[in-house]
């Protein structure tokens, strides 16, 4: 369905990090720089024989189009709940020791970290599988969206999934108008 109405977007990004943590799970949405070392420290355990760390960064192109920056937004209360459910499921499914999922909100320039996933498990194969599955589940299920800005001013809103079609937008960082 398309419409000729213009829709303005003003990000409602929390000014501080939003966290849900237990002894074995840490999920976080934050407008601040991501701390992969803190995530690694969280998942460290004497019963873990392997720790896997994934750091996703903003690349400078998408489908051969030059990207100038990304901006992430979310429905934060639901996204935190979804991330926690993902972490709980992965922890049980792969018999992991601990897991951390940290996602950036707001502006994320080229080369900066947008997501950190750390997983520990008694054995390396479980940690590898859990780390990859955590990333895919987060991209597929978490209520997080990104505005991918291209050089030249045009941008695309899309779910936080690679290769999915988005909604074209024009404009700067404030008051972005979506074309439907």
Curated annotation (Swiss-Prot):
<dbReference type="GO" id="GO:0006777">
    <property type="term" value="P:Mo-molybdopterin cofactor biosynthetic process"/>
</dbReference>
<comment type="similarity">
    <text>Belongs to the MoaE family. MOCS2B subfamily.</text>
</comment>
<comment type="subunit">
    <text>Heterotetramer; composed of 2 small (MOCS2A) and 2 large (MOCS2B) subunits.</text>
</comment>
<keyword id="KW-0808">Transferase</keyword>
<comment type="pathway">
    <text>Cofactor biosynthesis; molybdopterin biosynthesis.</text>
</comment>
<dbReference type="GO" id="GO:0030366">
    <property type="term" value="F:molybdopterin synthase activity"/>
</dbReference>
<feature type="region of interest" description="Disordered">
    <location>
        <begin position="161"/>
        <end position="180"/>
    </location>
</feature>
<dbReference type="InterPro" id="IPR036563">
    <property type="entry name" value="MoaE_sf"/>
</dbReference>
<dbReference type="InterPro" id="IPR028888">
    <property type="entry name" value="MOCS2B_euk"/>
</dbReference>
<feature type="binding site">
    <location>
        <begin position="146"/>
        <end position="148"/>
    </location>
    <ligand>
        <name>substrate</name>
    </ligand>
</feature>
<dbReference type="Pfam" id="PF02391">
    <property type="entry name" value="MoaE"/>
</dbReference>
<protein>
    <recommendedName>
        <fullName>Molybdopterin synthase catalytic subunit</fullName>
        <ecNumber>2.8.1.12</ecNumber>
    </recommendedName>
</protein>
<feature type="binding site">
    <location>
        <position position="139"/>
    </location>
    <ligand>
        <name>substrate</name>
    </ligand>
</feature>
<feature type="binding site">
    <location>
        <begin position="123"/>
        <end position="124"/>
    </location>
    <ligand>
        <name>substrate</name>
    </ligand>
</feature>
<keyword id="KW-0501">Molybdenum cofactor biosynthesis</keyword>
<dbReference type="GO" id="GO:1990140">
    <property type="term" value="C:molybdopterin synthase complex"/>
</dbReference>
<dbReference type="InterPro" id="IPR003448">
    <property type="entry name" value="Mopterin_biosynth_MoaE"/>
</dbReference>
<keyword id="KW-0963">Cytoplasm</keyword>
<comment type="function">
    <text>Catalytic subunit of the molybdopterin synthase complex, a complex that catalyzes the conversion of precursor Z into molybdopterin. Acts by mediating the incorporation of 2 sulfur atoms from thiocarboxylated MOCS2A into precursor Z to generate a dithiolene group.</text>
</comment>
């Amino acid at each position: 369905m398309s419409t000729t109405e213009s829709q303005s977007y003003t990000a409602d990004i929390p000014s501080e990090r939003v966290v849900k943590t237990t002894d074995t799970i840490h999920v976080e949405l934050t407008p601040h720089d991501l701390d992969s070392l803190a995530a690694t420290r969280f998942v460290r355990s004497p019963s873990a024989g392997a720790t896997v760390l994934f750091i996703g960064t903003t690349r400078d192109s998408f489908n051969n189009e030059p990207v100038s920056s990304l901006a992430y937004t979310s429905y934060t209360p639901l996204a935190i709940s979804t991330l926690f459910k993902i972490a709980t499921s992965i922890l049980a499914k792969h018999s992991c020791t601990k897991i951390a999922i940290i996602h950036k909100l707001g502006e994320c320039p080229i080369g900066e970290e947008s997501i950190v996933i750390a997983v520990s498990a008694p054995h390396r194969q479980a940690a590898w599988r859990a780390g990859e599955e955590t990333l895919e589940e987060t991209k597929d299920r978490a209520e997080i969206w990104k505005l991918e800005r291209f050089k030249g001013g045009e941008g695309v809103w899309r779910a936080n999934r690679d290769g999915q079609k988005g909604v074209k937008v024009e404009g700067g960082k404030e008051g972005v108008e979506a074309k439907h």
